[in-house]
């Protein structure tokens, strides 16, 4: 097979051009959005009957940002609900909306509808082409190669008005653009559509692994939407590898696969291969017996060049385990986007995930940035949590090192929409900013004057998990937290799922370590004054976070949409966690 290069220079050349002229391109993007959707009910409410085509770019931007308010999903929800109920008049877009996406509801505990149009699928195809082009500069792959992709299409349902609802990834995997992406990038997923859309995580994952090994010599890289999914898949593989070897040897399929369409599709692809089964068995015995599964991916897929997934933000906790499985294989952080819009591409795929930032693609949406400043005194106004907000600025006015909340105006009918993501401008690619994702704005632990971010929590758990691994043979599999404000005094609760055995003394030390590792001044003072109670560590039984994921997937979300929230107030999730708690510890720090 030949190395893929054709077409990469063209798409990179396009992006270099729009990046160089990002300011002008952003003005053109806003104009295109407003011209395409001129006259829709929502824009008429704020802009009246203004003739967009007769205005110059500067006047149009000024008018738009002065008259159209910044909104949250709650402000647009009545319009989206009318669309869902079957109203066909142009409310948000001139293009009829027949499909709605479920935006991730794992952070606030509820699902949100977002319009999905052909533009959504087209930008997904474009960013995948662009990402593949930049990756090929460092990790060229062979034409016609395979991808071991752990991808899952969730369930779809119909609204009262007959619109199809599902996750954005579910819509994409069913689209022509998904097929085009494989043909354009010359890389083909190992699994057929019947596996991707199977709807049962365990059965789908088993088949992904089986077919990945069936095509093992052809696999060029391993991928999934989130690093969590890859880690979960290979953790599952540790338990079922013998079963997979038996299937490869006999050309059969385990009885655990009960979905008829999936069974038929997989059985049509595999044939008995005793020599491959023996080879895999030999490697797995060595991995299991002597290596603790270190290097699993690189040993079983020797031609794989890298592993690709979202690895930033709430995916950072899974990097250590992913690196363990990778065994030196490069980890490439996938691009930055949301259900609402793709935002930025990773133009530096050779960098470790911890150092990655994303170059904003100025044609995908019109971007604004709300400057965020840490609160200095109590007299500040316009305070939201731990920040003072300044007036939003366009992409052309962002500053290096400044933190912002992203605001989107999209082709799909979201106007000056607060995304909730806090980002930092780390550098520039030509004329477009490169953004580092900091955290979701509302994911902050707080009882009173204390303010701890997702990054703070991650650092605290990292310190305690290192202590756990030094003193025991156990490791933290997953975690989340909750600010218990009902108890008096309120306190932080951190839930751990661990693998291996850890005695109570070690876990008590871990609990104490986490309590003292929060260095936010408001927290330390409050703990000393006992206005915040001792931190509580709750250890949950094995498989608990899997139950949480299944519950979310069961509510019509796809696993590709699911991310373990690092802080939760969701009552359903808390019920699962609390019902599964097997040990509790309270910190003795500050006694």
From Swiss-Prot:
GO terms for cellular component: chloroplast. Its EC number is 6.3.2.-. It comes from the Eukaryota. The keyword Chloroplast does not apply. GO terms for biological process: response to light stimulus. Keywords: Ligase. Transmembrane segments: none annotated. Expressed in cotyledons and hypocotyls. One of its GO terms (molecular function) is ligase activity. Belongs to the IAA-amido conjugating enzyme family. PANTHER family: GH3 DOMAIN-CONTAINING PROTEIN (PTHR31901), INDOLE-3-ACETIC ACID-AMIDO SYNTHETASE GH3.10 (PTHR31901:SF48). Catalyzes the synthesis of indole-3-acetic acid (IAA)-amino acid conjugates, providing a mechanism for the plant to cope with the presence of excess auxin. Involved in red light-specific hypocotyl elongation. May act downstream of a red light signal transduction and determine the degree of hypocotyl elongation. This is Indole-3-acetic acid-amido synthetase GH3.10. The gene is GH3.10.
């Amino acid at each position: 097979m030949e190395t893929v290069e054709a077409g990469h220079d063209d798409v990179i050349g396009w992006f270099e051009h729009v990046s160089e002229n990002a300011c002008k391109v952003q003005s053109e993007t806003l104009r295109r959005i407003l011209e395409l959707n001129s006259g829709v009910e929502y824009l008429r409410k704020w802009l009246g009957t203004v003739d967009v085509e007769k205005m110059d770019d500067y006047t149009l931007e000024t008018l738009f940002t002065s008259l159209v308010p910044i909104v949250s999903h709650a402000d647009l929800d009545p319009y989206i609900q009318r669309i869902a109920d079957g109203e066909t008049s142009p409310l948000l877009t001139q293009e009829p909306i027949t499909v709605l996406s479920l935006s991730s509801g794992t952070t606030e505990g509820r699902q949100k509808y977002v319009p999905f149009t052909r533009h959504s699928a087209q930008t997904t195809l474009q960013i995948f082409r662009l990402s593949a082009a930049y990756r090929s500069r460092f990790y060229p792959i062979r034409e016609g190669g395979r991808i071991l992709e752990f991808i899952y299409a969730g369930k779809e349902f119909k609204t009262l008005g007959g619109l199809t609802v599902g996750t954005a990834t579910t819509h994409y995997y069913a689209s022509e653009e998904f097929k085009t992406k494989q043909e354009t990038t010359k890389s083909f997923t190992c699994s057929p559509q019947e596996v991707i859309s199977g709807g049962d995580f365990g059965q789908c994952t088993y088949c992904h692994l089986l077919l990945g090994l069936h095509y093992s010599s052809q696999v060029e890289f391993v991928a999934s939407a989130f690093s969590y999914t890859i880690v979960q898949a290979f953790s599952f593989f540790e338990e079922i590898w013998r079963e997979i070897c038996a299937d490869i040897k006999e050309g059969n399929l385990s009885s655990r696969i009960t979905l008829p369409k999936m069974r038929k599709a997989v059985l049509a692809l595999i044939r008995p291969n005793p020599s491959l089964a023996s080879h895999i068995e030999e490697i797995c015995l060595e991995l299991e017996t002597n290596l603790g599964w270190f290097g699993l991916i690189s040993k079983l897929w020797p031609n794989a060049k890298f592993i690709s997934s979202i690895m930033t933000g709430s995916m950072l906790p899974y990097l250590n385990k992913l690196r363990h499985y990778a065994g030196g294989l490069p980890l490439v952080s996938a691009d930055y986007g949301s259900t609402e819009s793709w935002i930025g591409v990773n133009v530096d795929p050779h960098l470790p995930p911890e150092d990655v930032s994303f170059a904003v693609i100025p044609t995908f949406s019109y971007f604004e940035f709300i400057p965020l400043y840490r609160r200095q005194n109590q007299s500040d106004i316009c305070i939201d949590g731990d920040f003072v907000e300044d007036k939003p600025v366009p992409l052309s006015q962002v500053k290096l090192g400044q933190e912002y909340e992203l605001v989107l105006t999209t082709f799909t009918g979201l106007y000056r929409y607060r995304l909730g993501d806090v980002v930092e401008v780390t550098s520039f690619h030509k004329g477009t900013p490169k953004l580092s994702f900091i955290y979701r704005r509302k994911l902050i632990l707080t009882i009173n004057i204390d303010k701890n971010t997702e990054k703070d929590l991650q650092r605290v758990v990292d310190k305690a998990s290192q202590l756990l691994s030094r003193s025991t043979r156990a490791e933290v599999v997953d975690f989340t937290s909750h600010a218990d404000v009902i108890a008096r005094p309120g306190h932080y609760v951190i839930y751990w799922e661990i693998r291996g055995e850890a005695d109570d003394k070690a876990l008590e030390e871990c609990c104490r370590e986490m309590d003292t590792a929060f260095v936010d001044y408001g927290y330390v003072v409050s703990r000393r004054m006992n206005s915040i109670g001792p931190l509580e560590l709750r250890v949950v039984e094995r498989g608990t976070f899997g139950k949480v994921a299944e519950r979310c997937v069961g509510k019509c979300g796809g696993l590709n949409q699911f991310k373990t929230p690092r802080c939760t107030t969701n009552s359903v999730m808390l019920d699962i966690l609390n019902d599964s708690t097997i040990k509790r510890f309270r910190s003795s720090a500050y006694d």
